[in-house]
Regions:
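Bacterial N-terminal signal peptides that target proteins for export
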Residues: 1-10
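An extracytoplasmic/periplasmic, membrane-proximal ligand-sensing/linker region
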Residues: 30-32, 267-336
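C-terminal lobe and pocket-closing loops
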Residues: 209-281, 326-336
Length: 336
């Protein structure tokens, strides 16, 4: 009898322990989650974050509020998320490359590998798009204009660290061109500037230019890839390697970033939601297909590895171009 009682007591302790672990693993938010989008409304980060947030609300059982806080190439909103209480209720979003440029440009002392839990959703590509009224019919004509009037062709981007700025800097790296940089508080305003004629061109992402391309307000000359881009409602956009044979760039991964230091059960719960909802989401897939993005959700180590694969070369692109204040190798980013 004594032995049976002891066994029963041990079993009861185990049941209670398992229950406690289960309770700790299941985070149930009791107030809305805020995602700080550190760019303007309507841009690439804003678009995909709103799609993912709507999908996650049901899985997490709470409202998710998107707050746009543009400024200093996204570093202001990102810092606000990083400095917020580590209770799991304040996240941010963006491209992995943003975090690389903040570090080497001295904008924000943050490291993607130590300071953030990364949840990726899509990968984006930049497009060389020109105002439909410009005379440039293909990329070779635009390149000739860059060379015949150095520093005069106007390029709209969302500012330092943005996908558009990375794109034009890559063209500069491979061709030696100079350009006149005109910056805006987000990809959408940059695209609108190109459409209105404030600038001749933009190198923002396909997802930001898609509607204007379909509406024939922007003429796409090349996609920054070694493969053509088939955009729904438009057709094929040729790869930039047709003109710049050795051009290389990787996919620009976008997602949601949760600061390190939040309770483990927050991350465990969001990872389960990402696996069960975002990685199977028809709405995220539809978004990617319609706007020229690649459906590429991941989390954990896989997301960290993917993010670093673009973060690393971008950090060195800025350093080699003389547009960084901090050498990447001094902050643990080896040359690829």
């Amino acid at each position: 009898m004594k032995l049976s009682a002891r066994i029963l007591a041990t079993a009861l302790v185990l049941v209670l322990a398992v229950g406690a672990v289960s309770a700790q693993a299941n985070w149930k938010p009791n107030k809305p989650i805020t995602i700080i989008v550190p760019w303007g409304a309507g841009g690439s980060t804003d678009q995909i974050t709103r799609v993912c947030a709507a999908e996650l609300e049901a899985a997490l059982g709470t409202k998710i509020v998107i707050v746009n806080q543009p400024g200093a190439s996204g570093s202001v909103g990102t810092k606000n998320a990083l400095d917020a209480p580590k209770d799991g209720y304040t996240w941010t979003a963006g491209a992995a490359a943003d975090l690389a440029t903040y570090k080497v440009q001295g904008m924000l002392d943050t490291d993607i590998r130590k300071d953030w839990h990364i949840f990726l959703s899509v990968a984006n590509v930049s497009v060389v798009g020109v105002n439909a009224m410009t005379p440039y019919k293909d990329f070779s004509e635009l390149l000739a204009a860059f060379k015949s009037k150095p520093g005069q062709v106007t390029v709209a981007t969302a500012g330092q660290s943005s996908a558009g700025h990375i794109g034009i800097e890559l063209i500069r790296k491979y061709t030696g061109i100079e350009y006149k940089h005109v910056t805006y508080d987000g990809g959408n305003p940059a695209v609108i500037a190109c459409v209105s004629g404030e600038t001749e061109m933009t190198t923002q992402l396909a997802v930001e230019q898609a509607d204007m391309i379909r509406g024939k307000k922007i003429r796409p000359l090349a996609v920054m890839s070694d493969k053509a881009l088939n955009l729904d409602g438009y057709g094929e956009i040729p790869p930039i390697t047709k003109w710049i044979k050795d051009f290389k760039t990787g996919p620009n991964y976008f997602g949601i970033f949760i600061p390190a230091g939040v309770p483990k059960n927050v991350i465990d719960t969001v990872e389960r939601a990402w696996k069960n909802v975002i990685m199977k989401s028809a709405k995220v897939q539809d978004y990617a297909k319609a706007r020229g993005a690649m459906f590429a959700p991941s989390y954990g180590k896989e997301a960290q590895d993917r993010a670093f694969s673009y973060y690393q070369p971008v950090a060195w692109l800025y350093w080699d171009a003389g547009k960084a204040k901090v050498s990447p190798d001094t902050v643990g980013i080896p040359k690829p």
